[in-house]
């Protein structure tokens, strides 16, 4: 991605942040793909643009629930035209916020690490579930399963709600849980009407200068969520998905030890992943 005339202040698994001033930053979504907390060598073409469009759609759709990082400005307000033109579809002028130090994970269905946990313990992240549940089954109620926020290259660790309260304070933990569950519930209902089941998702929150909880980073994208096609959903299976699960499944079968460097992902797997991302965008946002 081309360099721009702003100072880079952070480079994450997928996003790069650039300083505009003490209140604003430019958030740029790259085409990088991370799986199992490792950044893969092979980018997914146009992925950053698709993620930005999906995120922006949800930020607007869910704005009645809570404030978000939008400033109301575009890249053309902060960059020269030649730079703005290159980045306009993958960059957002965002408020600078103090990140809440936990990942807010919400699950509506039993899958992934939650399914593995349930098979071993009958619980997901310490939350007891009914006996005899199957893979991909809808949970009796939506559950909040926070995790630590690891540095790039480290693994996030699931924690209990009590531990979450110890890290960020009980009152803030309760607010994060309530907002995350409401965001997921409303989004899942809408997505289902468009043919997508949102199995689970991860929200990121920050605090503004007044201490107001604010939704930030990315929202309900194929990178932060597990999206399933509703017409292929079947309890007791690992449903196909619209997200990077396609790459994750390929990596799982490759015999890779999940430590950097990752193996080279075949071109057809990359192409199918691009198609999945684009299909999710179309289903969610088309009129």
From Swiss-Prot:
Enzyme Commission numbers on file: 6.3.2.6
**Catalytic reaction annotation:** 5-amino-1-(5-phospho-D-ribosyl)imidazole-4-carboxylate + L-aspartate + ATP = (2S)-2-[5-amino-1-(5-phospho-beta-D-ribosyl)imidazole-4-carboxamido]succinate + ADP + phosphate + 2 H(+)
Q: What class of enzyme is it?
A: ligase
| Pathway the protein acts in | Purine metabolism; IMP biosynthesis via de novo pathway; 5-amino-1-(5-phospho-D-ribosyl)imidazole-4-carboxamide from 5-amino-1-(5-phospho-D-ribosyl)imidazole-4-carboxylate: step 1/2
Ligase as a keyword of this entry, yes or no, is yes
Q: Name one Pfam family in it.
A: SAICAR_synt
GO biological process terms, semicolon-separated: 'de novo' IMP biosynthetic process
Q: Can you list the GO cellular component terms from the UniProt entry?
A: cytoplasm
Record carries keyword Mitochondrion: no
Q: Which UniProt keywords apply?
A: ATP-binding, Ligase, Nucleotide-binding, Purine biosynthesis
Q: GO MF annotations for this entry?
A: ATP binding; phosphoribosylaminoimidazolesuccinocarboxamide synthase activity
Family, according to the entry, reads as follows: Belongs to the SAICAR synthetase family.
Q: What is this protein called?
A: Phosphoribosylaminoimidazole-succinocarboxamide synthase
The record lists the organism as Neisseria meningitidis serogroup A / serotype 4A (strain DSM 15465 / Z2491)
